Amino acid sequence: MLNTLPTDLCANTPSITIRDNRGFAIIALTYNRTNTHQAPEQLINRNHYNALSLLAASRDPRLEVDNFRYQYSLSGVPLRTDSVDGGSTLQLADSAGRTVLTRDAHHSRRWVEYETGEHSLGRPLSYREQANGGLKTVTDRFFYGENSEQDKGCNLNGTCVRHYDSAGLQALISQSIIGIPLQQQRRLLTDTKGPVDWFGEKENWGTRLSESPFVSHSTTNALGQLITQTDAKGHIQRMAYNRAGQLIGSWLTVKNGVEQPIVYSLTYSAAGQKLREESGNGVITEYRYEPQTQRLIAIKTTRPAKKDRPTLLQDLRYDYDPVGNILAIHNDAEATRFYRNQKIVPETTYRYDALYQLIEATGREADTNGIQNSQLPTLASLNDSNQFVNYTRHYHYDRAGNLLKIQHTGASQYSTHITVSDSSNHGIQQQDGITARDIRSQFDAAGNQRQLQPGQPLRWNSRNQLQQVEPVPRNDGISDSENYLYDGSGSRVVKISLHKTHNAIQTRSVIYLAGLELRSQYNGNNLTEDFQVMTVGAAGRAQVRVLHWESGQPADIVNDQLRYSFDNHLGSALIELDSDGDIISQEEYYPFGGTAVLASRNTVEAKYKTIRYSGKERDATGLYYYGYRYYIPWLGRWLSADPAGTIDGLNLYRMVRNNPVRWSDSNGLLTEEQISMYVNMLSYIGLKNDDELKSELLNYGLSEEEQDQIYLNMPMFTQSGSSSSSATSLSENSSSSGSTRSIDSGYISPIKNYHFFEDINLATMHRPYPIEKVSSEEIMYAAAELKENSHIEVLIGLDLTSKNLQSYKSALADEGIDYITKGKYEIEDFFNEGGLSTEQIDITVNKILKLQESAIVGVHCGAGNGRSGIIASALAINKLYATNEVSSFNVTHPLGGTMPGNKDTYQVDIVTASAVGIIRKTNPQAVERNEDVSALYDYSYLLYTRQHSTSL
């Protein structure tokens, strides 16, 4: 559902890119304002490129110095990066391009040792690290499957089978033929406090590891999807899928128990979006989407009828502006209330500036709420949860996107001020006596915050991972603290909390394993509680956690309690239900993550809720753990600099571009939308692995540094949970799809995504040559395959050329196909921001019309849908104007895009929609983007004006 958009706010606030004579974007201009009475403020981002055409420096609109500076070797390999937020890093590579030495801002060094020898594969053998002024230690050792009968029987040849890392030993016992782990073993360090050192012979390392390993087992189907997963304590999860590979059911068997359903059924739309989900407790969740944009517009959750309880649990409705910002969320399951002379409507509303940063939010909160800080608000009983008041929040930012002030009006009136450095984006909550110049001392050289609150020190390890927080430091004894241990991939595997009481030290520990958390509590040396939390990760939208006590079970909770958590569009846990569908807890959130409403049926059960905002775990410190970083919800910023660099912008502390209502972050690197965008781009341009992506990104003008930040740091390009050393490229795991014929990894069939449109006598297809250099035999085969299957006589290349172009052109000529690949027919895609101009479209269409007088013509682009779809649609537009045959191809839904501003847009719209209908009739994936449609509108209007009085 669309709501009213203040279009005047965005008037005269364009985004402008200025390029140098080499085509590089050197200046990006944006304009912003928060209300229509303000004049737009100009914001200037600058890039500088060196003589090698490599990005040398970037600067944001706020600072007078460069945010980032880059230095390269003579061959263009990145050597050094200087960041005002994250400090200086140095990396050196060997002659094969492999990183052999890195040095971070602390001057901590890491050396990588690789296999050597004539027949070696060049795999990493060890990591050696040395903190500044410390001793050199071996932090990681890698051992690979040999050519033994046992390794061959378990599909382990050449695979990393034992990884000694910073948490202990991770061993792979067996894997499927397509590389999916089937049996794994984890042994943790017995001493989690001291530095790890795997120096010497591995026979001597066993004493440093726990005696009892944690072993997990899995079974998979032919697609590599999990069918069963048996965790380290013997609990079994089972999953089922439909023919499309979508989850349709899941079950859980607690050890020595009876299998019970977690998800009864799931149904999906044709677009793959979830429509209906029935949980094991009988609760049904239904989803609705806006037809044109496929945006989520409603989530409705109901439970089975039962005496003295309502069946409707939540009924969320979403209002959007035309670009996708959420303007309001209504919960029709809640009643409007009146309290303290206020009308309390169960809805939240949002307002944005011209850059789509959130500047105002309204909603409801508990009347007992005070100033938001690291503590949760007062817990209310479910029976007393009706005492709400309205709140309004205003958010203020600087020119670089730093959140400076949160102004709150509601149960309490207060403002949270954030002091930001005048030389970086470092920032902390305002303190007496701390000025912008003093902020530098509050962060270490790598951009890690030194204190959570005044007097609460933070300690970081040599890999810039948070190692310890001391909420209550003591000089004369053991401090209250929370300590963390990470494995070689950077994932947290152990959390230990120490709390001093009058009589003893209370210790709480959590061990994180696949699908399982092992939690325990000690008072001194006495074990007071020991329980396991099974996390059902494939349970649809309703995430389920099962609590199983071995000892110390609380009186108010049944053993093996199922807790179904129902969330919103961000994944934030709103309602917890038990196996009978009764409410355990309810929670509502402010934007940026604070808790506005918190209620539970009893205080004991409330203590065991750990997953909250955005589906992430909230620690006792008040921080949220995202994976790569920790998040400060009461300040709306990250605790440390983004380890992925500028992948989410020059400000390394900004949270989801200051639009936390629309976007979420899955792992502390970048927004979910960006991850989806890159994955879709990979698929859209017809690439199947990260090597091809890197080559293609070069065509889009991205520097090698930017390419590395995209394809090396993103989790979808490595196996989940694997270390950086044993991460597997998609090129090693992915099989080809469609009509791709695997001569070798570089070959792409020229008839992939081939379509012939009889109405316009034109063929479109995927790029008919590989990106990487391949053999002449493969090029000849591809040319023959195209000739045999398409019968085209002329082929026009619409995308940029590659190193195979001339060889392929000659091969096509031998097959009698003329390949036109130069001049104005090489058209830049909309990924390059410029897009297809009306002139380019007009020239190309006229060329095709001329060629069609004597030949069968085809066109190609990266994937055969974008540029090819535009040119095919434009050719259809041209022929519709020439023949006046419109109505038979008319489509009944709007296309999107931007119409030209003139009085004849109705006629132009009919012709454009009819033409796109012709193309989509054969290729439904063509012309999917609004930018493509806008280009076609402009071309259609050009033809309309030429005909002047054309009658439609």
Residues covered by each model-derived region:
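A motif-centric feature for acidic-aromatic and gly/ser/thr-rich catalytic loops and repeats
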Residues: 554-627
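Thioester-forming pentapeptide GCGEQ
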Residues: 1-45, 50-51, 213-215, 222-225
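Short turn/helix-capping motifs enriched in Asx and small/polar residues
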Residues: 581-599, 607, 622-623, 628-629, ...
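Cysteine-based protein phosphatase catalytic domain of the PTP/DSP
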Residues: 745-753, 757-856, 873, 877-937, ...
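Acidic/glycine-rich beta-solenoid
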Residues: 35, 63-68, 72, 78, ...
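Low-complexity, glycine/serine/proline-rich disordered segments
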Residues: 667-744, 949-952
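Hydrophobic, small-residue-rich alpha-helical packing segments that form membrane-like cores
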Residues: 39, 44, 48-52, 64-75, ...
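Carboxylate/His-rich catalytic cores and anion/metal-binding grooves
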Residues: 27, 37-40, 44-59, 172-183, ...
